[in-house]
Regions:
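A general secondary-structure junction signal
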Residues: 33, 62-64, 75-77, 215-217, ...
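Substrate-binding cleft of carbohydrate-active enzyme catalytic domains
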Residues: 134-328
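Substrate-binding cleft/loops of secretory-pathway carbohydrate-active enzymes
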Residues: 327-339
């Protein structure tokens, strides 16, 4: 092939059309002596993917560099590259993936797999030098609308993200998670469980994808604020039938009720320990009803922007108490630049 067809395209590459490497049953996958258990995960992933692609399983081993056999695919740790960078070299008798970190080796593995999917068992020679342009490469996944995905479906999504070097998955949950003590909200929703989140988080770590929790803690808490236990915390009383518009446009917490903050804290305490990421997206968008109902009297001393920020800061502080770095949507605060 005269061009590389890769996503994303590497920063630089040099093709060597006259050079060919043949993937055969005698090809070994070799880890250098500096490689660790994370690098073994990359090697085993390559082994598994190649078995599915070409029909035979290559052996995996580890040795000192001077003992490399040929033909082989070599995972080599070096000192001089950036954190997520890698070099991929395809020569006639060997393939080398070089990186300073396990992330780099993993990304080099993904690039090699793309090349093999394009070319088959006879690979053209190439020298690739690559490093992602952006430190945060995220995908936001809302699992609250329609069918809740099962764990295997989410794992499949993680595999696809990792293949394209996406390193962050923000998982948006509301009633699609089985919060402890909230069964009236999720009992008929087939929600994700705490155990499934733990397993997904572990799966993400092995593929260098950061799993970031995200859920509503201020506005559009539709299922929570329509429940018998918590409907008294809704800014506007609502007994209407379900509609997609009302699901998003209403059901904001009553910030004048101290129990609203207690609810927020309870939800956080139930979910945050399940995620290894330090990041937490607290939502806090689309608080359309704020100050229009039960909390209206607070506007005697605060404007609606100040009312929003005051409760937002309380939520942020709870998250910080759990040692989390907070993200939130900016649709509301951007209307009040002075805040």
């Amino acid at each position: 092939m005269s061009h590389l067809y890769l996503q994303p395209m590497p920063r630089s590459y040099v093709k060597k059309e006259a050079t060919k490497f043949f993937l055969g049953t005698n090809t070994e996958i070799i880890l250098s002596s500096q490689c660790n258990s994370q690098d073994l995960e990359s090697a085993l992933l390559l082994q598994q993917q190649l078995h599915e692609l070409i029909g035979f399983r290559l052996s995996v081993t580890k040795c000192f560099e001077r003992n490399y056999s040929t033909p082989s695919i070599r995972f080599i740790k070096v000192d001089e590259l950036e954190e997520e960078a890698y070099d991929l070299i395809i020569e006639e008798t060997y393939i080398e993936i070089k990186a300073t970190t396990s992330k780099g080796l993993f990304y080099g593995t993904q690039t090699l797999l793309q090349i093999i999917k394009n070319e088959g068992v006879e690979l053209s020679g190439v020298e690739i030098k690559d490093c992602p342009y952006f430190r945060n490469r995220g995908f936001y996944h809302d699992v609250t609308r329609g069918k809740v995905p099962i764990l295997e479906t989410l794992k499949s999504l993680v595999d696809k993200l990792a293949h394209y070097k996406i390193n962050q998955l923000q998982l948006y949950i509301e009633h699609s998670f089985a919060f402890t003590g909230f069964s009236e909200i999720w009992y008929d929703k087939d929600p994700l469980t705490a155990e499934e989140i733990l397993l997904l988080d572990d799966y993400c770590q092995k593929r260098h994808v950061e799993l970031v929790p995200s859920f509503a803690l201020f506005g559009h808490l539709y299922e929570v604020l329509r429940s018998e236990s918590y409907k008294h915390l809704c800014e506007l009383d609502d007994e209407s039938e379900f509609s997609f518009y009302d699901r998003m446009a209403h059901h904001t917490l009553d910030v004048s009720n101290e129990a609203s903050l207690e609810l927020v804290e309870k939800m956080m305490a139930d979910v945050l320990p399940l995620f290894s990421s330090k990041k937490f997206n607290i939502g806090c968008d689309e608080t359309f009803d704020l100050g229009k109902g039960k909390s209206h009297h607070l506007l005697n001393t605060l404007n609606d922007g100040e009312l929003y920020v005051e409760f937002l800061n309380k939520i942020i502080q709870i998250a910080k108490n759990h040692d989390k770095d907070v993200l939130f949507w900016g649709d509301v605060v951007l209307r009040y630049e002075h805040l």
